[in-house]
Amino acid sequence: MSQSPTNVPRSYNSVLDLKLASPTNSASGATGGWIVQKFGGTSVGKFPENIVDNIVKVYSQTNRVAVVCSARSSQTKSEGTTSRLLRSADLAENDKDYQPLLNAIEEDHVTNAERIQSEEIKQELIKDTKQEIEHVRELLHACQIIGEISPRSLDSIMAVGEKLSCLFMTALMKDHGLNAVYINLQDVIPLSYDFQKGFDDSFYQFLSQEIGKRVLQCDKEREGEEDVIPVLTGYFGVVPGGLLNGVGRGYTDLCAALAAVALQADELQIWKEVDGIFTADPRKVPNARLLDSVTPEEAAELTYYGSEVIHPFTMEQVIRAKIPIRIKNVENPTGKGTIIYPDNIGRRGEATPPHPPAAFEQLAMSSLLQRKRSATAITAKQDIVVINIHSNKKTLSHGFLAHVFTTLDKYKLVVDLISTSEVHVSMALSIQSDQESQLKHALVDLRKMGTVDVTKKMTIVSLVGKQMVNFIGIAGNMFKVLADEKINIEMISQGANEINISAVINEKDTIRALKSIHAKLLEGGSAIGDSSAVDTRLEALKLS
């Protein structure tokens, strides 16, 4: 008799949860569609057995599962494998000794292989690990001789982090009885690919198709075997100018998104070390609540202004394909998590949704009849520098602004918020410790245009909510809360899409501002007004 798998969510926060709990699904083989699960480097470093036994193994009982892994991190991203590989490359380029750092990476991964019980699988993993590290040594030696590292070489060095992580997770899954297969995507982009159009939609469509082909080819080669679990490297090949410059450190999320699109997945799952998206950072605001769902627009704003959710560009790929994204916690796999719903639940041009309305009728009432809210969440972005420039009037206003932005672009400084008049500009910039030198040089150039005042140690506090556009007085309420707390506002801004209201305040007031705004606008009496866009779509679907 078929049984529902254990350790699955009992609050049906998505159609996938319904499949997992359904008694009609066999525990011996997957009957549902694909799901793509992306695991970050810290999760792979700290909780690999939990990932295999309580997540991949459980979901693979009812669905086809594809896994994408970031490079392994034992504690923090700064001490992760990718960061250490990049530091090794920097040492080699400057003719310094990179061997100790590379030896530490090798030792860390070989030691980690001791988690594998099967001696055969363990020794194979150690052999593969040492081969990858030796490849990096050869590359770094060559780069040290010529005194420079090309973007292509840097990509190849950086790719080893994802390879080592996926080799380990594949071995661990095999050790725990799963039919996992390692798929290296390093050469998924052919050398003949024409990049004349750059990173446009056609490139990502092509890349998605190629990733899908690799997965389906793997299936075909193992036809007749128990359902294969492909483990994909988050790194997906050499691109002009380098992957870091072209995509950034979020390339693993992007790879998972493209795989989900290619496989027409039921869901893309992003597994982190938090339960989902909260109304505020629970480390700073103890009363913060877990959100059952947010819209893509809200998730994008929260990501940009301080909450690490998922990169907006990555999210765009799956939202366009009408695939839900679920944020879940590797330490609490049975938790509800947070769903990011597409704007239109139907997908691929269909008039009807991908899943029958009857399934949605069984969704948790918390998803269908969410509390009506004016704002969704409050977030903070620290390490902000405010620059005020008053023109010396030697240039016209358009020339003044052009000079300002040209200077910022020259030193690769990004503006988070800006307020302008004909002869005055106020800007809030996020400046990390490794950008201090660029900021210093930029200020020298900016002072040629007029008087420049700089204020450091500031924070951008942002109130986010798609329904705020329908409420009168939200901005006034937010600023009144700050005034009541005697918190001075340096700058204010409202996004053109009207789902984000931001204020720049002193960094020392950050926690007090978050707590007070959360208490007054996101708790209790704030639950008034129209329902969220997600509520409206799901309710309409329920009644159809």
Curated annotation (Swiss-Prot):
Oxidoreductase found in the keyword field: no
Uppermost EC category: transferase
Reactions catalysed: L-aspartate + ATP = 4-phospho-L-aspartate + ADP
Gene3D superfamilies attached to this UniProt entry: 3.30.70.260, Acetylglutamate kinase-like (3.40.1160.10)
Pathway assigned to this chain's UniProt record: Amino-acid biosynthesis; L-methionine biosynthesis via de novo pathway; L-homoserine from L-aspartate: step 1/3; Amino-acid biosynthesis; L-threonine biosynthesis; L-threonine from L-aspartate: step 1/5
InterPro entries hit by this protein: AceGlu_kinase-like_sf, ACT-like_dom_sf, ACT_Aspartokinase, ACT_dom, Asp/Glu/Uridylate_kinase, Asp_kinase, Aspartate_kinase_CS
GO biological process: 'de novo' L-methionine biosynthetic process; homoserine biosynthetic process; threonine biosynthetic process
Known EC number: 2.7.2.4
Database matches in Pfam families: AA_kinase (PF00696), ACT_9 (PF22468)
SUPFAM superfamilies according to UniProt: ACT-like, Carbamate kinase-like
Disrupted-gene phenotype: Sensitive to sulfometuron methyl (a compound that increases flux through the threonine biosynthetic pathway). Does not decrease survival in a mouse model of infection.
Domain ACT: 463-535
MF GO annotations: aspartate kinase activity; ATP binding
The UniProt record lists the keyword ATP-binding: yes
GO CC terms in record: cytosol
Keywords noted in UniProt: Amino-acid biosynthesis, ATP-binding, Kinase, Methionine biosynthesis, Nucleotide-binding, Threonine biosynthesis, Transferase
Function: Phosphorylates aspartate, the first step in the biosynthesis of amino acids that derive from aspartate (the aspartate family of amino acids), including methioinine and threonine, the latter of which is a precursor to isoleucine.
Family stated for the protein in its record: Belongs to the aspartokinase family.
This protein's name: Aspartokinase
Native source organism of the sequence: Candida albicans (strain SC5314 / ATCC MYA-2876) (Yeast)
